[in-house]
């Protein structure tokens, strides 16, 4: 693995760091993937509370970083299934019924690149190859900037992120994110702890209701209290063939005015989702216990998301005979039960008729809209 970050596919590696961090009284933000390797090594200023546990944490982090930090690597892999698997979780490694991939990666001091080609069989697409998980990235100061596409997972759930997950193919575009987070001596900002952010501007496919719209996304997460993570997330589907692609319309979308007034050329210029997620973890008799939830809504008319849906979960992480174990219980509900109750609301849109999807599959939860899902899983 030659990436400047660790992807959601290797989430279980991060669980041991999460276990050691909570036991030592500090936090690691495990609610957003990919996670920069620099953030693994320096997750929180309070990591020095217990020298013994800190040494254990650093040893595990260094082992992960050493594994991920090879300068050059080639990878080949394949998967084969009798049928297309509609289930996909945070650590799922393949997306298609049958697939074969090859990738070539480079990781330098300030520069990283990856070219990956996948040949696949999928019921949702006519084209049988793509270049998902290919990018060029540059580290500048405390930022990672780049161009390309890769999977993102925004939210604390292990089975379905409501706003951005690995279920659809990754779309191409530009991105910028924090390398190891930001802190400030200013009292107001310092109160929120370490801040991590991620932003991208992608373009979606032509084979949809509105051809080639743009997808903008941003996430800010913070740790105001050790063990407690707050994430704020927003995505905007904007423009495309036949829509208003002007800078004014873009500003109206970003500022929130697009949902409260009509533009000059287009009365419904974007499709937005926004919301927040919370995760709190604590140590109880050498078991790290977490509670978490995500709350997302469709376009709002008063600068607040409405037509909302949610997920809830809890996780137990512990060591048994020196091996890490994880028990997860989650519930996800993408029905909307408020005003204008009915079906075809979540992930749907009157103008962007292909909905909140890319190449036919949801950008958010794999269960799509009008669904609920409960799951119990054990890893170890």
Where are these regions (language model features)?
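Transmembrane beta-strand segments of Gram-negative outer membrane beta-barrel proteins
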Residues: 7-19, 55-117, 145, 194-199
């Amino acid at each position: 693995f030659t990436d400047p970050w660790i992807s959601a596919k290797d989430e279980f590696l991060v669980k041991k760091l999460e276990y050691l961090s909570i036991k030592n009284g500090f936090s690691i933000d495990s609610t957003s993937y990919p996670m920069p390797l620099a953030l693994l090594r320096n997750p929180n200023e309070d990591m020095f509370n217990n020298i013994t546990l800190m040494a254990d944490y650093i040893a595990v982090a260094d082992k992960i970083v050493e594994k991920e930090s090879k300068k050059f690597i080639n990878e080949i892999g394949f998967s084969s299934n009798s049928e297309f698997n509609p289930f996909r979780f945070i650590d799922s490694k393949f997306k298609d019924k049958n697939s074969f991939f090859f990738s070539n990666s480079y990781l330098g001091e300030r520069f990283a690149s990856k070219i990956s080609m996948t040949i696949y069989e999928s019921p949702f697409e006519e084209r049988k190859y793509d270049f998902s998980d290919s990018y060029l990235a540059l580290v500048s100061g405390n930022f990672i900037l780049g161009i390309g596409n890769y999977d993102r997972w925004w939210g604390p759930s292990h089975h379905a992120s409501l706003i951005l997950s690995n279920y659809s193919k990754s779309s191409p575009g530009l991105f910028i994110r924090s390398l190891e987070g930001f802190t400030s001596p200013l009292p107001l900002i310092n109160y929120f702890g370490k801040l991590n952010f991620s932003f991208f501007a992608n373009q979606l496919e032509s084979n949809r209701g509105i051809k080639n719209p743009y997808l903008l996304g941003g996430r800010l997460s913070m740790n105001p209290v050790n063990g407690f993570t707050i994430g704020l997330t927003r995505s905007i589907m904007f423009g495309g063939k036949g829509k208003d692609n002007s800078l004014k319309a873009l500003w109206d979308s970003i500022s929130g005015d697009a949902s409260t007034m009509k533009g000059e050329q287009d009365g419904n210029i974007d499709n937005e989702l926004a919301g927040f997620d919370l995760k709190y973890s604590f140590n109880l008799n050498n078991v790290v216990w977490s509670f978490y939830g995500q709350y997302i809504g469709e376009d709002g008319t008063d600068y607040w998301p409405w037509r909302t849906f949610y997920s809830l979960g809890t996780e137990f992480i512990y060591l048994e005979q020196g091996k890490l174990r994880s028990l997860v219980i989650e519930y996800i509900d993408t029905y909307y039960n408020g005003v204008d109750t009915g079906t075809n609301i979540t992930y749907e849109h009157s103008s962007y008729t292909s909905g909140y999807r890319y190449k036919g599959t949801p950008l958010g939860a794999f269960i799509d809209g009008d669904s609920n899902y409960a799951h119990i899983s054990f890893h170890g």
